[in-house]
């Protein structure tokens, strides 16, 4: 008799995705982040659900409802901080996952990669609207500044901003709709993640060497289930260390002050995971130019398959490209640091240089380096 997991219509899908899936025998721990992102998403949906039971999306009570969750709800503080710091863990896993894709040439799976970029945008949108909900100073002014960027769009900009606000300023209507978006988007992310996985399983996983691995496959379970569980343990350990010992380490103290439209904080800045894009936005003195650079900094990932000029898929055997990749990582860390600094000398200049370097490395230096490496293969 055939095993039920191979015949049952529902279990068959799970079986083909997580149990009997043929996986390359040499994929490293860099391939763990897909499953970790899945765990992060489940964790965020569950903690978010319990927070939504006590949260009120009204300008008068939003701030106090978050305080009420932390003070009066049973284990409300841990749920709140798991949700807030869970977002940080989510983005750490996301950046490492994308970095892995760039390093090992996984972007040649076009459908998987493009849906991944859409997922990145969706997660960023979710995090942005979520940051507005506690209705602290940084929530309010972050929402005001970022939504205001849309006014840079010629002709329809101002109307668009007021349409998103639901009025002439960030107010009750804005908060209510942002809560609605923040509730629905994670489920859209979950659906997109399934499509992401569907397309990945059409081709099978890439591997560190970037060569076909059809001749050497092993079942996903037990090998990679055990390996993933180890990753999950590390994820939960680091998250709980953050939540229990330094819950406000990555937050902004300004967000413990209730939103006040009459008082602008001295430094308006987003959460740490948006700082690199914020630095690129600020490095251009023109409003529309800054907005275009901001969008391009993420959208540039779509171009990666077109910019791939190397005869080898992975960077494993390409030392020059490896150097460039790590320079790019250092550049992104520099941008992240600059995004959190005040707009004054020397930070403005450093930000502008780092922004130019970011686009220069991806659009010009990487394709040229790959071509040089191709010619070196002939020797």
Curated annotation (Swiss-Prot):
A Pfam family assignment: Cytochrome_B
GO molecular function, one term: ubiquinol-cytochrome-c reductase activity
Membrane-spanning residues: 33-53, 77-98, 113-133, 178-198, 226-246, 288-308, 320-340, 347-367
Cofactor(s) for this UniProt protein: heme b
Residues the record lists as binding heme b b562: 83, 182
Recorded GO CC terms: mitochondrial inner membrane; respiratory chain complex III
Entries under InterPro entries matching the protein: Cyt_b/b6_C, Cyt_b/b6_C_sf, Cyt_b/b6_N, Cytb/b6-like_sf, Cytochrome_b, Cytochrome_b_C_euk/bac, Cytochrome_b_N_euk/bac, Di-haem_cyt_TM
Residues where heme b b566 binds: 97, 196
Primary site of residence: mitochondrion
Residues involved in a ubiquinone binding: 201
Recorded superkingdom: Eukaryota
Coiled-coil annotated spans: none
CDD domains noted in UniProt: cytochrome_b_C (cd00290), Cytochrome_b_N (cd00284)
Keywords: Electron transport, Heme, Iron, Membrane, Metal-binding, Mitochondrion, Mitochondrion inner membrane, Respiratory chain, Transmembrane, Transmembrane helix, Transport, Ubiquinone
Membrane-related topology note: Multi-pass membrane protein
Co-factor binding comment: Binds 2 heme b groups non-covalently.
An individual GO BP term: mitochondrial electron transport, ubiquinol to cytochrome c
Subcellular location(s) per record: Mitochondrion inner membrane
SUPFAM superfamilies attached to this UniProt entry: a domain/subunit of cytochrome bc1 complex (Ubiquinol-cytochrome c reductase), Transmembrane di-heme cytochromes
Family assignment from sequence similarity: Belongs to the cytochrome b family.
Function, as annotated: Component of the ubiquinol-cytochrome c reductase complex (complex III or cytochrome b-c1 complex) that is part of the mitochondrial respiratory chain. The b-c1 complex mediates electron transfer from ubiquinol to cytochrome c. Contributes to the generation of a proton gradient across the mitochondrial membrane that is then used for ATP synthesis.
Other known facts: Heme 1 (or BL or b562) is low-potential and absorbs at about 562 nm, and heme 2 (or BH or b566) is high-potential and absorbs at about 566 nm.
Subunit details: The cytochrome bc1 complex contains 11 subunits: 3 respiratory subunits (MT-CYB, CYC1 and UQCRFS1), 2 core proteins (UQCRC1 and UQCRC2) and 6 low-molecular weight proteins (UQCRH/QCR6, UQCRB/QCR7, UQCRQ/QCR8, UQCR10/QCR9, UQCR11/QCR10 and a cleavage product of UQCRFS1). This cytochrome bc1 complex then forms a dimer.
Record protein name field: Cytochrome b
